[in-house]
Design a protein with these regions (language model features):
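Hydrophobic alpha-helical segments, especially N-terminal targeting/anchoring helices
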Residues: 16, 229-230, 291, 295
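Local sequence-structure signature of Cys/Sec-based thiol-disulfide redox active-site neighborhoods
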Residues: 21-62
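C-terminal outer-membrane/trafficking sorting elements
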Residues: 253-319
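Surface-exposed coil/turn segments at beta-strand junctions on protein surfaces, enriched
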Residues: 19-21, 135-137, 152, 200-204, ...
């Protein structure tokens, strides 16, 4: 049998934003129900608008107990009710934007544009970075970095973390309004809907949440949404949603390294697989590619947002 020995060029690229203005992600929270006729008519307008603004708009749909049957409400009635009541939702559909632009109605592109642009004009005092990782078995690990740029003024600030299912599809309508497709459905809040106290002093704060995927949830559709909200006036200061660490990338430690590094792969030369370690001092979009001796790209091992930390992955030349 012919033995092949491989020696390849491995390139690590990290794109980070340094000393730039913090980007606002605008949070749209809707109350809806699978047996609500106006919801069936209005939701497509909101969903279409959101899909055209994915870069800076985040949505969570809370399913109410009324006016009729809704299995997404029944899956977590207590927390769904708590968020609906917190948002002063007394009729469906109701859409609030960043907690302080209340009850957009009717649902129109112009109304959503106006609310969105109004909030984008407000510079956020903090940023949130969320990275999700599937844990073998039945869990998701969410690593969150909260950066408070300046000391916050007086207020009651809460840091809230929620599991959201991006898409739920039924073969037949689960309620009476004919809808079979539901987007960004609220599933559960951690540790609860109250959240935890948000630090008000400028600095960087790290959080890790590991939660189980419940039986009804579709694994690949779950994403973590995190936001900071002032309970005094319900304003959302900023929000973000998780990006996933690709399968096969191991986060060795979340300890921030002293400097960026791409270690020599081992073994080298190798046949047919090798391990690659790298370190990031800041979170950013990370690309890790393998090239042959002729400069041709052989494989793209990483192409995603990663947080600061040390990582390891494997390249297998046999495919």
């Amino acid at each position: 049998m012919k033995k092949l020995i491989y020696s390849l060029l491995i390139v690590l690229t990290v794109i980070v934003t340094v000393n730039g203005q913090t980007t606002r992600k605008v949070l749209f929270e809707e109350g809806t129900n699978a047996s609500c006729g106006p919801c069936a008519a209005s939701n497509p307008i909101l969903i279409s608008w959101l899909q055209n603004h994915q870069a800076q708009a985040i949505s969570i749909m809370y399913h109410a107990s009324w006016p009729g049957t809704d299995p997404m409400y029944s899956a977590n009635p207590t927390q769904s009710t708590e968020r609906i009541q917190y948002n002063n939702i007394t009729a469906v559909p109701t859409c609030n934007v960043d907690g302080i632009i209340y009850d957009i109605w009717p649902f129109t592109v112009a109304a959503f544009d106006n609310a969105f642009n109004t909030r984008l004009a407000v510079t956020p005092p903090l940023s949130i970075d969320v990275v999700d990782q599937r844990i073998p078995g039945d869990s998701i690990k969410s690593t969150i970095t909260l950066i408070v740029n300046t000391n916050l003024p007086a207020g009651t600030y809460k840091f809230r973390v929620m599991a959201v299912e991006k898409l739920i599809t039924y073969s037949t309508p689960p309620g009476s309004n004919g809808e079979t497709v539901f987007h960004t459905v609220f599933r559960r809040a951690y540790p609860n809907t109250v959240g935890v106290d948000c630090p008000t002093t400028a600095g960087t704060y790290n959080y890790t949440y590991t939660y189980k995927r419940e039986a009804a949830w579709k694994d690949t559709s779950i994403v973590t949404v995190a936001f900071v909200q002032n309970d005094v006036n319900k304003e959302v200061l900023n929000a973000n949603k998780g990006t996933y660490i690709p399968t096969g990338i191991n986060n060795l430690t979340s300890e921030v390294p002293y400097q960026y590094s791409l270690e020599q792969n081992y073994p080298n030369p190798f046949n047919p697989s090798t391990r690659i370690k790298f370190a990031l001092t800041k979170s950013g979009f990370t690309s890790l590619k393998v090239y042959d001796a002729m400069g041709r790209e052989v494989s793209s091992l990483v192409s995603s947002q990663l947080q600061a930390g040390k990582y390891e992955t494997e390249f297998n030349a046999s495919g």
